[in-house]
């Protein structure tokens, strides 16, 4: 039975009074469980009342949205929308991962990077140099010139109180080199040349007018200025010497050897004479020349060793006394014009000429060490004087250990 418009309006779709099978209508009151696209900003859209039934077309669309995946929903929205702006807004709301990736900055090559670093360093250096140049040209920190002294006419100069010295600037101050203390002492004062005093009755000259002074011959600075001690100059006292040749050293040793040999022979012959020994030749061969043959007994060998030890001690005593008390020279060195001086440092100045520091006289301790090493090295079958061939300035091993050097007696200066 057909229903009128009023009755059809009062019942929801799918329901009638007669009963029977009816198709279920999905409810649209609750929100859908699946993701829905981002709503469009439409100012004319009005919210739907919760009790008002929806149209059949909307119910079918909602049922289809539940079954369609988001990708198909996006394709459907793109097909339905014809505006480019709405498509970009929907794509940005539904799939933000579809946005275009950001462009990375281009990587510089090694050559381009080096060029930019070099340019930056050059700009930094120019700025630093400009800053210091501007500070140096700034005259605010320059020390003022002292005011000229005035003297009364016809009278002597009136002594005035000395002006206080200008403040010294620290080395870290950029104006340090402008201070008078950084310029060093006056060369005329260092050389011992006094500044002429002003004449009474004459006023001072203008600062821009220079007095004409006749140049006078000046002797060496060392003669004009008083001699300074090494502690004042800050340098160690030294002296220049000439290094003797190997021939001079050898001849001096030979002279000392013959002198000591005659002393030894004199002592041995005196002992023989006092002992009443008749066989002088055999005794002399054993104890003077120290020759051993097949007839030498063990007792004679022991006596020879005792005599050799006494002889070495005599030689040590001879060199200790001569080098310590006789001006640093044995008779052989004295005849050849040689002497022994202390040497902590030796600097070569010219060929065969060295600066010896401190070049003082040899003490008794140094002389004892030198003599013992020299003589007992020979007794141990190692002649230490051969080492002068290997060390600088013809120094031997005992010279280096004792801190001495053999030079010519007359130094250069």
From Swiss-Prot:
Keywords assigned by UniProt?
Membrane, Phosphoprotein, Transmembrane, Transmembrane helix
Region of interest (Disordered), residue spans: 1-105, 217-236
Membrane topology per record: Multi-pass membrane protein
Example of a GO biological process term: ERAD pathway
Which residue ranges have biased composition labelled Low complexity? 49-64
Q: Could you tell me which residues carry Phosphoserine?
A: 229
- Tissue-wise expression: Ubiquitously expressed, with a higher level of expression in testis.
Necessary and sufficient to interact with SYVN1: annotated segments: 107-139
Q: Which residues form the RDD domain?
A: 242-408
Q: Which GO terms describe its cellular component?
A: Hrd1p ubiquitin ligase complex
Q: Which residues cross the membrane?
A: 257-277, 304-324, 371-391
Under the heading InterPro entries, the entry gives: FAM8A1, RDD
Do the record's keywords include Transmembrane helix? yes
Bias (Basic and acidic residues) ranges: 1-10, 65-78
Keyword Transmembrane in record? yes
Location, primary (coarse class): membrane
**Intracellular or extracellular location(s):** Membrane
Q: Where is the signal peptide?
A: none
Q: Report which superkingdom the organism of origin falls in.
A: Eukaryota
Which proteins does it associate with, and in what oligomeric form?
A: Component of the HRD1 complex, which comprises at least SYNV1/HRD1, FAM8A1, HERPUD1/HERP, OS9, SEL1L and UBE2J1. This interaction stabilizes FAM8A1 protein, preventing its proteasomal degradation. FAM8A1 binding to SYNV1 may promote recruitment of HERPUD1 to the HRD1 complex.
**Described function:** Plays a role in the assembly of the HRD1 complex, a complex involved in the ubiquitin-proteasome-dependent process of ER-associated degradation (ERAD).
The protein's name in its UniProt record: Protein FAM8A1
- Organism, per UniProt? Homo sapiens
């Amino acid at each position: 039975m057909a229903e009128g418009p009023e009755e059809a309006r009062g019942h929801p779709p799918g329901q009638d009074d007669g009963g029977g099978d009816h198709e279920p209508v999905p409810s649209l009151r609750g929100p859908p469980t699946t993701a829905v696209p981002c709503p469009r900003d439409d100012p004319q859209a009005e919210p739907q009342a919760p009790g008002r039934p929806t149209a059949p077309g909307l119910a079918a669309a909602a049922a289809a949205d539940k079954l369609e995946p988001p990708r198909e929903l996006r394709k459907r929205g793109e097909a339905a929308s014809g505006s480019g702006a709405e498509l970009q807004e929907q794509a940005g709301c539904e799939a933000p991962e579809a946005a275009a990736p950001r462009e990375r900055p281009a990587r510089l090559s090694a050559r381009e990077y080096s060029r930019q670093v070099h340019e930056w360093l050059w700009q930094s250096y120019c700025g630093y140099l400009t800053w210091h140049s501007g500070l140096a040209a700034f005259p605010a920190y320059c020390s003022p010139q002292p005011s000229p002294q005035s003297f009364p006419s016809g009278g002597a100069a009136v002594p005035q109180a000395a002006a206080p010295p200008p403040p010294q600037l620290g080395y870290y101050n950029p104006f340090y080199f402008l201070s008078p203390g950084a310029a060093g002492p006056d060369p005329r004062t260092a050389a011992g040349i006094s500044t002429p005093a002003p004449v009474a009755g004459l006023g001072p000259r203008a600062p821009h007018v220079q007095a004409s002074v006749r140049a006078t011959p000046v002797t060496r600075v060392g003669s004009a200025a008083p001699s300074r001690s090494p502690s004042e100059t800050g340098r160690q006292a030294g002296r220049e010497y000439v290094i003797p040749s190997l021939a001079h050293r050898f001849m001096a040793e030979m002279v000392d050897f013959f002198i000591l040999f005659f002393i030894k022979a004199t002592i041995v012959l005196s002992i023989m004479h006092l002992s009443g020994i008749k066989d002088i030749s055999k005794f002399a061969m054993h104890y003077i020349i120290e020759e051993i043959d097949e007839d030498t007994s063990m007792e004679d060998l022991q006596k020879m060793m005792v005599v050799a030890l006494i002889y070495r001690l005599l030689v040590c005593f001879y060199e200790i006394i001569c080098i310590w008390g006789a001006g640093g020279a044995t008779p052989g060195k004295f005849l050849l014009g040689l002497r022994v001086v202390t040497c902590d440092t030796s600097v070569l100045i010219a060929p065969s000429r060295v600066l010896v520091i401190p070049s003082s006289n040899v003490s008794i301790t140094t002389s004892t060490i030198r003599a013992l090493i020299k003589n007992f090295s020979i007794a141990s079958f190692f002649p230490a004087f051969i080492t002068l061939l290997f060390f600088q300035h013809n120094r031997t091993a005992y010279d280096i250990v004792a801190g001495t050097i053999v030079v010519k007696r007359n130094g250069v200066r």
